[in-house]
Amino acid sequence: MKKISKLLLALSFVLSVTTSAFAVTVVSWGGAYTESQKLGYGDPTAAKLGIPVNWVDYTGGLSEIKAQKEAGAITWDIIDVYAKDTIVGCDEGIFHEFDF
């Protein structure tokens, strides 16, 4: 529940500071899990703020995230990762601290 709450808060924050000219890309695990995120808070938040949310499936790990950062072509805004990947990603400077 805490993980979902943080993801929801992050999504709300990102959506609130962007304009309607931008879309937010949320990366999650796919299937019923992602569908529940979309229906539960993704679609309602996007509709309320008038900002499109693009959903992308991924299989986990940090390799795709590292590749985007190293190439200077970051296309993912919010990523649903395991706690262990969060710790490693923060330690390696892959993720930015989000103080809320």
Regions found by a protein language model. Name each.
Residues V24-V88:
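Early extracytoplasmic/lumenal segment of secretory-pathway proteins
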Residues M1-L8:
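Bacterial N-terminal signal peptides that target proteins for export
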Residues Y82-F100:
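Hinge/lid segment of periplasmic solute-binding proteins
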Residues V14, A71-I74, F95:
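A general structural signal for well-ordered secondary-structure junctions
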Residues T18-A23:
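Sec/Tat signal peptide C-region and signal peptidase I cleavage site
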Residues L8-L9, A71:
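Short secondary-structure boundary micro-motifs
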Residues L9-S16:
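Bacterial N-terminal signal peptides
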